[in-house]
Amino acid sequence: MVLLLLVAIPLLVHSSRGPTHYEMLGRCRMVCDPHASRGQGPDGAPASVPSLPPGAKGEVGRRGKAGLRGPPGPPGPRGPPGEPGRPGPPGPPGPGPGGAAPPAGYVPRIAFYAGLRRPHEGYEVLRFDDVVTNVGNAYEAASGKFTCPMPGVYFFAYHVLMRGGDGTSMWADLMKNGQVRASAIAQDADQNYDYASNSVILHLDVGDEVFIKLDGGKVHGGNTNKYSTFSGFIIYPD
């Protein structure tokens, strides 16, 4: 009886202080106080955490998303002036009195003649860039087009040298404002070169364009030899 009291009294005292954990070590009971401080040294001071050496450098992360678009910057410096444009067609007659009529037999001077320097193939406008004659400046070598400056009747002729040798043929059309007005064909009959030629007389109004368009095949470029040529002139004005 006395032994039971000796065991029960300590248990009642500890249970009144709070929850207590204990373990059995053989025949001895070890009581653990949950309120005891943790992570302290022998003198009650906080225990220091041992420092570890730095690890290896990690890899570069992925690139982030692009940010919001910023405001437009200031305008840049002014660029150089462009090249002068082509002269426009003559305007309509003004309200003033008409000028004197041209003398009888007067013919305006409009004529051009140009050769082809570089080869062409496929489907493109032939730009006869080796200009020999351009009276009136109505022909433009950069575009290969003649633009009518005065209404009237005009004559045009073209001769195009085919670059063959592979069994193909070549077609060349004279165009007026995108419509075919004359055609020529050269066929490769076991030859390396052959000619396609034609001529036409057309009535033109101011601003009408006349040019030669390749409709398949290959055209030989003659450097300055002028194997392929395009020419035209006015016969009489309206």
UniProtKB/Swiss-Prot annotation:
Described purpose of this protein according to its UniProt entry: May regulate the number of excitatory synapses that are formed on hippocampus neurons. Has no effect on inhibitory synapses. May inhibit adipocyte differentiation at an early stage of the process.
InterPro entries assigned to the protein according to its UniProt record, in alphabetical order: C1q_dom, Cerebellin_Synaptic_Org, Tumour_necrosis_fac-like_dom
Limits of the Collagen-like domain: 53-96
Superkingdom classification of source: Eukaryota
Tissue spec. comment: Highly expressed in testis and adipose tissue, brown adipose tissue expressing higher levels than subcutaneous and visceral white adipose tissue. In gonadal fat pad, expressed at lower levels in adipocytes than in the stromal vascular fraction (VSP), which contains preadipocytes, fibroblasts, endothelial cells and occasional immune cells. Expression exhibits sexually dimorphism, with higher levels in females than in males.
Coiled coil: none
Full protein name: Complement C1q-like protein 4
Induction comment from the UniProt entry of this chain: Down-regulated in fasted animals.
UniProt KW keywords: Collagen, Secreted, Signal
Main location: secreted
Gene designation per UniProt: C1ql4
Segments of this protein annotated with the region Disordered: 37-102
Single GO BP term: negative regulation of fat cell differentiation
Signal peptide segment: 1-15
Gene Ontology terms: cellular component: collagen trimer; extracellular space
Compositional bias ranges of the Pro residues kind: 71-96
GO MF terms held by the record: identical protein binding
Subcellular location: Secreted
Subunit annotation: Forms homooligomers, predominantly dimers or trimers. Forms heterooligomers with C1QL1, C1QL2 and C1QL3, when proteins are coexpressed; this interaction does not occur after secretion. Interacts with ADGRB3.
Domain C1q: 105-238
